[in-house]
Structures are given as structure tokens and as C-alpha cells.
């Protein structure tokens, strides 16, 4: 028995409509404040259905409906999975992160729920669509005319519904502007197209803004050595050194704080994704003016061009996002971050033969989720019970928080080991800066992970820990307690620490000059 092409399109539009359940849940929430929620709700629900139907008439012509229909199902179903389970918004920056994700990180999201989701919401519907015997009208002209009529009628129905209730529909969407970011499959497809265009566009010539940079000679008895620890997905809200009380996540660095050799600060991130925050914090641009289309030298380039020895080691799967492209860099991709202790020891040994001002960047894998339980060795499993799966919905809030806190504690241990290496090194005046790229949501208000647009991101995603340690007591005294910092300070602090002068250096943003 054959089914008409138009009936299949109606059924497909209805299924895509159902996959928009996150969108409709947000609509229902917004309708609580509407004067006539029933009429407005019907208008929106019916309007979305007919818009989807008109889209299918355009992009799913006869003979291609099984291919394009399957594509729309895949996009909508997987988008709905991450939106529903992690509270993700699939904007351009998130899609850039997707394009840069390696197999190891992608597999960290694999769990039983995703397998079931794929089976019942992707494979089964696509299998039914492919198995259908669809009745097509003969003749290209006839098929085109019927398809065109279907498009016009469905879009017309949507338009009429909106126009008849425009006095309610238009204000509703103005007051709930984020709804457009939940609509499937349009928003993720639009975001992916923008991300792909950004990745495929030829890189702009590098702006050599460090050309005017100069550096006064270091008259101190010892050269400066700065270890810059670039964190991953650590949020300030989970640092006991910043007032967090559930678990003592800073047990290892506490002695240095007590001895006034180290201090912690709550800082604002530049973004909620590594692909944004890392290039931004090393850039001369502040967060409000940051533009990733501008290809300019960064703080690392300034230091290298003025004679500072620069080394970059990482264990983060995402790499350095272009920041270390023009200096010596090595990424390990190991299971745990303790490989960076060995890297630091070896580099310190190498620098013994050429004692001059130097910076060593250590980029940790840190607290990257959702597989938090894989970020620390078993001996660091101090806080229990834990959530030993990437399906966070299976775990209690207490289990998720304990597991995440173990990752923070492990990073704290690593930092204490880095400091220990600096403490026993007599060749350099050693200092250390630690700052995370962005924070993390652990289920607060139903939101997990990170990556929400900055304007609506919760504090858990935008507030990150900043820590400074130094063997130089005078330097420690110059960094003021109780002062607000952000990643905007990093570029200027790095230049100021090594005495680099440039028109791009702003003394007011240098943490040691405020």
C-alpha cells in the first residue's frame, strides 16, 4: 500500500514538531503571563507546525524526501538531546567547539541514554521513513506545482494565524527573545553554517601589533620565571579558598595561602567556551570589544618577541586555540594531568642552562565534563559518593558535585606540585598564575556543562578562580586583596610582569599596578 507524498510530509512535520519539545516547554512557561494563553498557545503551536511543513515542501521534494527528511530528523533529534539533557544552546560558538572536538572528547558523551535516544528517536523514525512506499505524481511539472501549492498554503496558514493574533504573538516573542534559539532544526543549522563559514574562511593576515614592544633589562639578581597554569572548566563557586564549604577543594594549596605566598580571587571569564575564553584572555582586546575575526599577535607573541623564553605544554584535547601557534608547544593527550609535572621538571632543567626570563604555560584538562570521574586518578577520589557516568541525569546532585569537586582537588594538588618545583629552584625568581578558561553548571536550574551565551549564562559559568603565587614577597604585597579581576587583566599583567612596554599595555589593567 502506497502513502501519498503529502501525508508523509504532514507526518514528518508533526514528528519534527514533537522534537521541538524544549521549545514548546519554554513557550508554555512564557504563556503563564499571557492574557489569553489558550489562543496564543494554539497560534504558536499551529504556526510552528505549518512553518515546518512549508520548509519540508521546499527542501523535501518528491524522490528526495527520504534523504532530506532523514537529515532533518538527525539534526533535530540530536540537538534536542543536548538541549534537554544539558541545557545547551547551539549557537555559533558552540558549533565551532563541535567542529574542533576530537574523537576522545566526543566519545565522553556516549552513554546508555544516548544509545536509547538514538535508537528510538533517530534510527526507528528514519527506518520507518525509508521503508514507506510513497506515491508520487507522475511528471516533474505536476510534482513541482503541487509542491509549490503546498508550500504557499502551509506558509499562508502560518502567516494568517500570526496576523490574526499579531497583537499578542509579536510582543510575546519580543519578551521571550531566546525562544528563537530553541527552534529546531533552524537555529542549530544556522549556527552550524556560520561556524563552518568561519572555519573555512581564509585566515586574515596576522596583525603585527607587537612591533612596538620593548622590554627593559631585568636588573634583579635572578631571572624571572612565571608558570602560567591555564585551567579548564573550573568554577569559582566550587573553591573552598573562595568560601565554598561543602568540600575542602583547596587542601593542597592552603599552606601557601596561610604563609602569604599565594592568594585566590574570584574573576570573570571572557566567555563560556574554551574557543572564546582562551584567545580572548591572551588578546589585547577586552571582553566587551573582543572580536575573533581580528587576527592579531597575543600576549605570548609579545613576550617571545621581546626575548622572554616561552614554552607551552598542554594535556587539553582542544589545544591552545591558536594562542601558541607561533611558539614552542606540545600537547600530550594523556588520561591525567600529572604528565605536566614531568613536563615542568624537564623544562626547568633545560632552562638551567640558559637562565633568562621565561614563561612556561601548562594547559590542564582539569574538570572537563561530562565524564568528571575520568579526570582524576582513584587515589584522588576523596569526596563520595560519586557520579561515574556521563549520563548526569542518573546521578543525584550530591554525587555530581562530589565528582566535580574531586577534579578541583586534583587540579589543586597539581598546582601545589608546580609550586613545590618553584620553591626548590634556586636559579629563578619563581611565580605562578592559575586561572580557568570558564566555569561550569552542575544542574542548577536544570543547566549542565557550559557554553550558554554570555548575556544569559549563570554565574557558575562566568566566574572562575584566579590564583597567584610568588617567592617574591614584594610582588605578593602588590596584588590587592578584595579587588575584582577578570580575564581582561591577563594580557596586561603578563606584559607588566616581564616589563614589556607597548601602546597596547594598560597599567590600569595590570593586576600588580592597580
Regions found by a protein language model. Give the residues of each.
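Alpha-helical packing segments of well-folded alpha/beta enzyme cores
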Residues: 51, 299, 340, 344, ...
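A long, amphipathic alpha-helix that forms part
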Residues: 183, 348-349, 387-432, 468
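Catalytic cores of PAPS-dependent sulfotransferases
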Residues: 58-67, 86, 302-312, 349-353, ...
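A short beta-strand-to-alpha-helix junction
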Residues: 290-295, 398-409, 455-462, 474-494, ...
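Transmembrane and membrane-interface helices of multi-pass
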Residues: 1-181
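Histidine-centered active-site microenvironments of extracellular/periplasmic hydrolases
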Residues: 243-248, 423, 428-472, 505-507
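Active-site-proximal alpha/beta segments of enzymes that process anionic O-linked groups
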Residues: 161-228, 233-388, 463, 487, ...
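Active-site-flanking alpha-helical
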Residues: 239, 419, 444
Amino acid at each position: 500500500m502506497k502513502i501519498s507524498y503529502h501525508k508523509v510530509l504532514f507526518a514528518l512535520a508533526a514528528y519534527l514538531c514533537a522534537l521541538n519539545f524544549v521549545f514548546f516547554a519554554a513557550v508554555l512557561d512564557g504563556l503563564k503571563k499571557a492574557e489569553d494563553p489558550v489562543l496564543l498557545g494554539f497560534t504558536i503551536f499551529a504556526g510552528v507546525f505549518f512553518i515546518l511543513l512549508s520548509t519540508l515542501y521546499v527542501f523535501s521534494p518528491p524522490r528526495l524526501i527520504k534523504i532530506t527528511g532523514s537529515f532533518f530528523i538527525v539534526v533535530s533529534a540530536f540537538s534536542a538531546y543536548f538541549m534537554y539533557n544539558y541545557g545547551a544552546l547551539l549557537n555559533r560558538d558552540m558549533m565551532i567547539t563541535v567542529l574542533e572536538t576530537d574523537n576522545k572528547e566526543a566519545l565522553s558523551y556516549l552513554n546508555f541514554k544516548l544509545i536509547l535516544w538514538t535508537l528510538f528517536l533517530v534510527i526507528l523514525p528514519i527506518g520507518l521513513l525509508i521503508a514507506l512506499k510513497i506515491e508520487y505524481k507522475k511528471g516533474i511539472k505536476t510534482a513541482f506545482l503541487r509542491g509549490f501549492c503546498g508550500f504557499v498554503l502551509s506558509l499562508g496558514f502560518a502567516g494568517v494565524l500570526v496576523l490574526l493574533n499579531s497583537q499578542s504573538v509579536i510582543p510575546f516573542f519580543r519578551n521571550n527573545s531566546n525562544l528563537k534559539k530553541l527552534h529546531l532544526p533552524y537555529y542549530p543549522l544556522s549556527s552550524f553554517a556560520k561556524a563552518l563559514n568561519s572555519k573555512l574562511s581564509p585566515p586574515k593576515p596576522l596583525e603585527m601589533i607587537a612591533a612596538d614592544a620593548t622590554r627593559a633589562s631585568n636588573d634583579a639578581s635572578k631571572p624571572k620565571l612565571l608558570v602560567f597554569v591555564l585551567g579548564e572548566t573550573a568554577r569559582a563557586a566550587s573553591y573552598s579558598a573562595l568560601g565554598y564549604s561543602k568540600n575542602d577543594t583547596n587542601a593542597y594549596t592552603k599552606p601557601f595561602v596561610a604563609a602569604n605566598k599565594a592568594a585566590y580571587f574570584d574573576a570573570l571569564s571572557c566567555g563560556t567556551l574554551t574557543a572564546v575564553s582562551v584567545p580572548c584572555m591572551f588578546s589585547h582586546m577586552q571582553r566587551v570589544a573582543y572580536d575573533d575575526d581580528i587576527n592579531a599577535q597575543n600576549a605570548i607573541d609579545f613576550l617571545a618577541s621581546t626575548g622572554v623564553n616561552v614554552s607551552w605544554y598542554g594535556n587539553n584535547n582542544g589545544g591552545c586555540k591558536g594562542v601558541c601557534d607561533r611558539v614552542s608547544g606540545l600537547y600530550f593527550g594523556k588520561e591525567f594531568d600529572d604528565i605536566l609535572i614531568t613536563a615542568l621538571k624537564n623544562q626547568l632543567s633545560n632552562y638551567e642552562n640558559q637562565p633568562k626570563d621565561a614563561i612556561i604555560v601548562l594547559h590542564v584538562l582539569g574538570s572537563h565534563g561530562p565524564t568528571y570521574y575520568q579526570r582524576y586518578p582513584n587515589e584522588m577520589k576523596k569526596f563520595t559518593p560519586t557520579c561515574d557516568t556521563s549520563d548526569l541525569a542518573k546521578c543525584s546532585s550530591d554525587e555530581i558535585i562530589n565528582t566535580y569537586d574531586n577534579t578541583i582537588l586534583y587540579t589543586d594538588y597539581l598546582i601545589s606540585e608546580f609550586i613545590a618545583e618553584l620553591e626548590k629552584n634556586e636559579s629563578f625568581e619563581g611565580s605562578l598564575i592559575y586561572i580557568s578558561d570558564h566555569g561550569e553548571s552542575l544542574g542548577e536550574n536544570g543547566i549542565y556543562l557550559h557554553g550558554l551565551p554570555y548575556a544569559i549564562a549563570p554565574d557558575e559559568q562566568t566566574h572562575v578562580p584566579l590564583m597567584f603565587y610568588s617567592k617574591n614577597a614584594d610582588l605578593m604585597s602588590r596584588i590587592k586583596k578584595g579587588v575584582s579581576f577578570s580575564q581582561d587583566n591577563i594580557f596586561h599583567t603578563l606584559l607588566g610582569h616581564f616589563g614589556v612596554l607597548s601602546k597596547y599595555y594598560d597599567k590600569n589593567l595590570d593586576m600588580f599596578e592597580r
